[in-house]
């Protein structure tokens, strides 16, 4: 067990909650103690849902352990069915309740309720949230279709348009709502109808219609891969596995749809030329070429982000990793292609160390990487769950398809542009026009702070700055050297300071001057 301030994934039962919360007519019953009943906070505060998630808890405590806790499960399942009248029930236990070995899924299935009851065994002490969502969705789809007696998929019919299922979007996912809308529009542009979107917004009756489609689109492999593989074995439905994140992947996605359906999608591929393509070639974006980028997130978004960064924006990928061990193989393959060491970990401190060592100029990651980048003073864009409330925007902001490519360009490039602006302000902040005591350009400017001049005078009297080198030796910076260091762009200033201090310590230099900075630069440039 590890004590931590942050976790990229919750326990598996959180994944099961996400599936239930994504759907209509599905209720999740969890055998759980009082401390595991925090679903309301996740879904109402972070995702800004207008209603409570459809989850009920047995909520056992110490006094219940002296009697039959299995009876408490039956009472909770009965109460949940009578109150909510769901079309299907998911029943499992939380990580704490798993220790009791009450088997709540089996208990609920033995109650002969008039609705399908899907028991979940989620292996809480060896798996995490992503697996819980994948397993809950798979068991729900399989349970409903086998109960329904479905035996064959859709037969080819030239009189109608091909039909597709979009599988994988969930509550608490990254931009799922808008991605579904954009991919639906993209498919319709080449003559493909969307049959079912699941689990997001689907009902159990919708899941029973999945076999009516001609093929499945695995939009979010972390959730839908195992379900798509089973549907292909059971009903012969092919799966489109390309995720349309970025212009290149969108073209590949349309080409794969064309191969699966036999449609001529050449015009759609030719038209897949979003504004991002021009912007990334335009004069005002030339300075972006070669920017060092560190990427960390779920497997799907991390690998896609690396491709976009390298092939479409001309960035240099200096770090690539994921917290999802189920996606480690794909991330390792991509990392090898970009010549970097893959980072497979769910320890945010290890991610911070790797990001610091990589000295990136842009960080792409989750909510935690946003905090890491802020501490490092590096621009950041969020590309993957887990995210906080600001990444569930009220506006339309997909990441997939053509409009998604435009959104990605804006989201990634604007922090760099604003970073350049901050750097210029930093360079010229000593200019007489930018001092705190300078008169405002506004007609009724605020009066200058009376303490401003005193502060400036006090700063000027500071003779030297003291720093700790990596080897622990104390080195001093002259005021001229500190001023010269501030002229270096903020996103590499930390690296320049560390290199200079290391250079000085190695050579026994006690006081760093401007000449020392340039000597260190020449040394490390070789």
Curated annotation (Swiss-Prot):
It catalyses: chlorophyllide a + oxidized 2[4Fe-4S]-[ferredoxin] + 2 ADP + 2 phosphate = protochlorophyllide a + reduced 2[4Fe-4S]-[ferredoxin] + 2 ATP + 2 H2O. Substrate binds at residues 419-420. It comes from the Bacteria. The keyword ATP-binding applies. The keyword GTP-binding does not apply. Its cofactor is [4Fe-4S] cluster. Binds 1 [4Fe-4S] cluster per heterodimer. The cluster is bound at the heterodimer interface by residues from both subunits. This is Light-independent protochlorophyllide reductase subunit B. It comes from Halorhodospira halophila (strain DSM 244 / SL1) (Ectothiorhodospira halophila (strain DSM 244 / SL1)).
């Amino acid at each position: 067990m590890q004590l931590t301030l942050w976790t990229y994934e919750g326990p598996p039962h959180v994944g099961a909650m996400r599936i239930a919360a994504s759907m209509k007519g599905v209720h999740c019953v969890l055998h759980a103690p009082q401390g595991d009943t925090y679903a309301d906070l996740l879904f109402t505060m972070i995702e800004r849902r207008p209603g409570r998630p459809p989850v009920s808890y047995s909520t056992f405590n110490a006094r219940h352990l002296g009697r039959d806790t299995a009876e408490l499960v039956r009472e909770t399942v009965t109460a949940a069915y009578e109150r909510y009248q769901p079309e299907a029930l998911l029943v499992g236990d939380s990580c704490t309740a798993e220790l009791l070995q009450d088997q709540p899924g089996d208990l609920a299935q033995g109650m002969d309720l008039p609705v399908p009851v899907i028991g979940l065994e989620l292996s809480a002490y060896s798996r995490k949230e992503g697996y819980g969502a994948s397993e809950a969705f798979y068991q729900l789809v399989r349970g409903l279709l086998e109960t329904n007696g479905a035996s064959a998929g859709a037969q080819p019919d030239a009189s109608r348009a091909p039909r597709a299922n979009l599988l994988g979007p969930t509550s608490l996912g990254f931009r799922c709502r808008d991605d579904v809308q954009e991919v639906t529009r993209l498919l319709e542009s080449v003559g493909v109808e969307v049959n079912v979107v699941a689990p997001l917004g689907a009902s159990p009756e919708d899941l029973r219609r999945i076999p009516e489609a001609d093929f499945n689109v695995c939009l979010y492999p972390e959730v839908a891969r195992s379900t798509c593989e089973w549907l292909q074995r059971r009903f012969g439905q092919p799966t489109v596995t390309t995720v349309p994140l970025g212009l290149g992947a969108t073209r590949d996605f349309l080409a794969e749809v064309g191969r699966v359906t036999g449609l001529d999608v050449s015009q759609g591929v030719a038209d897949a030329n979003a504004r991002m393509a021009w912007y990334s070639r335009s004069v005002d974006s030339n300075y972006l070429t070669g920017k060092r980028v560190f990427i960390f997130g779920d497997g799907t978004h991390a690998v896609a982000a690396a491709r976009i960064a390298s092939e479409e924006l001309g960035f240099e990928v200096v770090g690539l990793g994921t917290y999802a061990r189920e996606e480690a193989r794909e991330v390792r393959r991509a990392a090898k292609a970009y010549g970097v060491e893959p980072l497979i970990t769910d320890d945010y401190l290890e991610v911070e160390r790797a990001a610091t060592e990589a000295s990136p100029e842009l960080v792409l990651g989750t909510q935690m990487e946003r905090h890491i980048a802020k501490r490092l003073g590096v621009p950041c864009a969020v590309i993957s769950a887990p995210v906080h409330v600001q990444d569930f925007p009220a506006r339309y902001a997909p990441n997939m398809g053509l409009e998604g490519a435009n959104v990605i360009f804006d989201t990634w490039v604007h922090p760099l542009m604003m970073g350049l602006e901050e750097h210029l302000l930093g360079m010229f902040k000593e200019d007489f026009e930018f001092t705190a005591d300078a008169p405002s350009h506004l007609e009724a400017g605020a009066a200058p702070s009376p303490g401003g001049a005193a502060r400036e005078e006090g700063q000027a009297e500071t003779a030297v700055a003291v720093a700790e080198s990596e080897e622990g030796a104390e080195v001093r910076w002259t005021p001229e050297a500190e001023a010269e260091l501030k002229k270096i762009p903020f996103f590499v200033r930390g690296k320049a300071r560390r290199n200079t201090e290391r250079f000085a310590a190695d050579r026994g230099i006690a006081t760093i001057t401007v000449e020392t900075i340039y000597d260190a630069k020449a040394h490390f440039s070789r």
